Amino acid sequence: QIIRPATVCGYSPRMRLDVAVNLLTMQALDKGQITVLGGNQVRPNIHIDDITDLYLFMLANPEHTGVFNAGFENISIMDIATEVSEIVGAEVEVKPSNDPRSYRVNSDKLLNIGFKPKKTVSDAIRELSGLYAQGALKNEEQSHNLKWMTKTLYS
């Protein structure tokens, strides 16, 4: 069994604030403004609870073999920003981007073997917003992989 996860969004003890859903949500919560570069780029997403459930599902069902894409929401960056804006209440600023890359995945193969995702990108945004309001989620440097690794390597 090979699982090819899409971009994982939602809360984890070791947060990733450099992936689209989490990044845009943190911008809205921290600054009250979301900066979108381009916006037409599409990213596939899967909630962290669903990818965890999928791993458990596959362990419990070893008869399902092969390669499985795991991503259930192919959403443009602009649509993610709009959803964050509606949930959190932040302004969206669009700037040009020279990176038009888009990624999409089809996970019908997983649906056909009986796996059903339970959570959405909107759920992740709401959960992150609630944790931020409780003080349990902070915009920490080590949650931005490239910045953190660069600082760690060159300091």
Region roles according to the model:
Residues 1-12:
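Conserved beta-loop-beta element that borders a ligand/cofactor-binding pocket
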Residues 8-10, 51, 75:
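Conserved sequence/active-site signature of Rossmann-fold short-chain dehydrogenase/reductase
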Residues 10-22, 32, 48-49, 57-68, ...:
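Glycine/proline-rich active-site loop of Rossmann-fold NAD(P)-dependent oxidoreductases
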Residues 15, 19, 43-49, 72-75, ...:
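Residue-level signal for the nucleotide or nucleotide-sugar donor/cofactor binding architecture
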Residues 26, 49-60, 122-129:
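Amphipathic alpha-helical segments that line or abut small-molecule/effector binding pockets
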Residues 28, 54-57, 61-108, 154:
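Mid/C-terminal beta-alpha module of Rossmann-like enzyme folds, strongest
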Residues 48, 78-79, 98-117, 123-127, ...:
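Conserved C-terminal active-site "lid" loop/helix of NAD(P)H-dependent oxidoreductases
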Residues 121-155:
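Amphipathic terminal alpha-helices
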